[in-house]
């Protein structure tokens, strides 16, 4: 990993009170595994947890602050420290599952009153406690490993502890609390105190820091031979495939059926089997050699759908027993009418350079066949799996893919090293429903003119070097200015579309410059050079690193002991009221 990547990573870990815009911009940067230091979740209030009123009864406060709750390795955690992990674990879970959390449990009811497992009687409070225990083992196993290895926090990481205290004071005042301890209590409950919270944060930070350092160092040890060995006999897993596809559901071929009082149509097994047979026949008729081009296959699909449409009309007329008096007005249709009618028919989907892991599983074996050649076409069944009353697995045909192979690539091409100067759009209005900021043509034009002016001044100066561009970026870019706008080892799909397409244009070469527009603004681009790392090696290395880190981390976790001494002070009456 480059020095610039490491610096960006440190910024991501340590930047306190990070704004939503900053977070969105940093999604473009490469990241190692992120151990979420959930203080940030709390600080920006991503998830609202209504915990009721925390009574500050002196006895209860003392008990929570000093009761021995957990022993993990050689560490004794007090009840309040357990609560820090507990509340943050819940916050993370709710934040991660916010789109469907209200379908998982009642967010307006205490978690301790909601059974999550009818067989064991476990509640959601029990489940969250189990998740918390896992997080504690994870954190302390890494922390102990860090201490044993002599790992220390970087200067920036050390500064984040001071920044944390400052921000806690700011938020305490902002939300009307008399002091920082009162603010922490409103989040974590009785016994919360700045000293114990800072200890919790520092241990979590140390665990994160060491994980990332170990990961970086391990990745540096990988050789090309090690990567080829890791690929083993499955090199296709890192290839990408270009193909056309068309999916047909069995529902299109169902006929007959009986409509119930609720309006739903049910089919006999004979009718369902007839539909499956018709689907199979239609798919096989589409998947013939003469249909292996886009136009030919689209025409065949249209003809099939017209046939199905006519059959449906005939069936409906038979059921209604009424005479169809509709006049054929085909000759009266204008060209626009005909074009509009064409839109109602299905067409093939063109899929370009799709990674093997993103292919529909039923297509993978056929597409990866090394004997596959351009224009090959086939029909591939899609089945659902269920269990019958005797416990036997039953497969049922639900659809068919018609697939046309076009090409594949082993992704053995270089990643990109690029510098850029971002001239962002200014102004704009935020859509209240989507949260997306939109800019007027005038606002976009202003950014474009500013970028073009700066670009022209640089070119007119006549020193068109990387160094001169880097200096210009340091003075003018609104992104990564400290590093002269440098991004190294960019892989396809990492950056926004127009930025990505410029970087990976087949004609791109060192020294190329230009301006591209993205949703962020206008980027003045300077192509530094091809990276020494190929996209393929980047993917293989990432996959190997993930597996190696999981193995290493599991070993640490398995080696550390944990005893639940007294966990009764967790808040089982917590209400997750996220406003969904």
Each predicted region: which residue ranges?
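Peptidyl-prolyl cis-trans isomerase
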Residues: 281-364, 450-498, 528
